């Protein structure tokens, strides 16, 4: 059961006298002007820094630049879900259809909401998925499918002609982005909704940097302080904001496994989204694909895990170049690789007994849902590298409702 939040402390005893800005305030004021001072939580600062580089109108032939991790100064390329197409979309369509027939048919439509940041990718997957369903379903059944494409951030004036050639009822939702609209508005959807985040959302959900203070006997949140000359500095404060405290409550209900002083990135924005989905769309099913944080456990660590619970770790930050958070350059995107097993625990904790999810590799998911005829076709492609090999070698993972 989810732990009840304690009343928040009034944030009047900040160590900095700089005015506090949120991401929404930075958007409305177009940032911090020269000569102006500001204090911004690190998660809001990263979101502000990322924002111009996420919802771009990229075409289908845009080549993304590799980024580097802070741990190693070497290129790090994320796997592309389109390398698994169209087979992945066929398997996803089967998963959606089976769950729909088992749980919601014939009383409800099959409502699919794809939250996206990469519009060309979202359109391609939608086209593959809807084309497959069109080819396998009766007209009456196919008409019950309603597909909605919802941006993570506002993306204006998307031409509807981009949907030409996609069969069925497909809508581009432009006026109601997930952030900040859905996270701030009061609404309730009673119909069952299938929510997709397909390899272009989780890595861009901003994180808080936190640490547990033995002196304060409590958590501290990281802030970025900007002086009149535009110089930036990092500081930690025990006066944490609401969304950070919400994330901490979900992740660390047992502090016995917290290492004092250790800095951890926690998925604040993602937890906020999952909480909003749970409260406002209770009859939902979730399907997430992304690059997870993976570890190579030693024999000693495996033996320890049998004795004591697995400690909650930090997400891995991935930057365009070293220390790009505090640089004046704004040409790249800061990403995070999150431990999917921790996300599974977080999701199951938020939804308690009402809903649960499980984690598996993309290759295992496709293996469950591919048909023998599809396997035969993909295994013998004319002179090309078989797509099943690409899927088998993919580092992508799936977190989906059970």
UniProtKB/Swiss-Prot annotation:
Q: What is its main location?
A: mitochondrion
Q: Which catalytic reaction applies to this protein?
A: L-arginyl-[protein] + 2 S-adenosyl-L-methionine = N(omega),N(omega)'-dimethyl-L-arginyl-[protein] + 2 S-adenosyl-L-homocysteine + 2 H(+)
The record's annotation in Pfam families points to:
Methyltransf_28
Q: What top-level class of enzyme does the UniProt entry assign? A: transferase
Q: In which compartments does the protein localize?
A: Mitochondrion
Keywords from the named record: Methyltransferase, Mitochondrion, Transferase
| E.C. code | 2.1.1.320
Query: Per the record, GO CC terms?
Result: mitochondrion
What InterPro entries does the entry give?
A: NDUFAF7
Q: Name one GO biological process term.
A: methylation
Q: Name one GO molecular function term.
A: protein-arginine omega-N symmetric methyltransferase activity
**What family does the entry list?**
Belongs to the NDUFAF7 family.
Q: What does this protein do?
A: Arginine methyltransferase involved in the assembly or stability of mitochondrial NADH:ubiquinone oxidoreductase complex (complex I).
Q: What else does UniProt say about it? A: Present with 1100 molecules/cell in log phase SD medium.
By what name is this protein known? Protein arginine methyltransferase NDUFAF7 homolog, mitochondrial
What organism is recorded for this protein?
A: Saccharomyces cerevisiae (strain ATCC 204508 / S288c)
């Amino acid at each position: 059961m989810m732990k009840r939040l304690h009343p928040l402390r009034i944030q009047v005893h900040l160590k900095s006298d700089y005015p506090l800005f949120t991401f929404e305030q930075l958007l409305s004021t177009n940032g911090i002007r020269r000569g102006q001072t500001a204090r911004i939580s690190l998660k809001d600062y990263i979101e502000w820094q990322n924002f111009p580089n996420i919802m771009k109108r990229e075409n289908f032939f845009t080549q993304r630049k590799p980024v580097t991790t802070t741990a190693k100064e070497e290129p790090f390329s994320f796997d592309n879900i389109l390398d698994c197409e169209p087979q992945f979309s066929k398997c996803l369509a089967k998963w959606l259809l089976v769950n729909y027939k088992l749980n919601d048919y014939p009383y409800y439509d099959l409502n699919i909401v794809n939250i996206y940041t990469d519009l060309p990718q979202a359109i391609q997957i939608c086209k593959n998925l809807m084309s497959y369903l069109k080819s396998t379903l009766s007209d009456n059944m196919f008409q019950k499918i309603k597909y909605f494409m919802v941006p993570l951030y506002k993306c204006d004036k998307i031409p509807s002609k981009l949907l030409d050639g996609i069969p069925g009822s497909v809508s581009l939702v432009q006026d109601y982005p997930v952030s900040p609209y859905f996270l701030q508005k009061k609404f309730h959807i009673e119909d069952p909704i299938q929510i997709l985040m397909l390899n272009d959302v989780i890595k861009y959900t901003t994180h808080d940097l936190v640490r547990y203070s033995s002196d304060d006997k409590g958590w501290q949140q990281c802030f970025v302080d900007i002086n009149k000359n535009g110089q930036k500095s990092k500081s930690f404060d025990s006066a944490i904001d609401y969304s950070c405290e919400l994330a901490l409550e979900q992740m660390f209900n047992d502090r016995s496994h917290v290492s004092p002083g250790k800095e951890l990135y926690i998925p604040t924005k993602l937890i906020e989204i999952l909480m909003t989905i749970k409260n406002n769309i209770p009859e939902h099913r979730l399907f997430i694909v992304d690059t997870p944080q993976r570890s190579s456990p030693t024999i000693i660590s495996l033996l320890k895990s049998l004795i004591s619970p697995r400690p909650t770790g930090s997400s891995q930050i991935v930057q365009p170049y070293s220390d790009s958070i505090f640089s004046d350059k704004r040409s790249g995107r800061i990403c995070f690789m999150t431990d999917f097993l921790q996300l599974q625990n977080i999701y199951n904790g938020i939804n308690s007994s009402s809903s649960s999810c499980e984690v598996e590799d993309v290759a295992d998911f496709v293996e469950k849902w591919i048909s023998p005829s599809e396997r035969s076709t993909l295994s013998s492609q004319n002179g090309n590298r078989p797509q099943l090999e690409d899927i088998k070698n993919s580092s992508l993972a799936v977190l989906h409702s059970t």
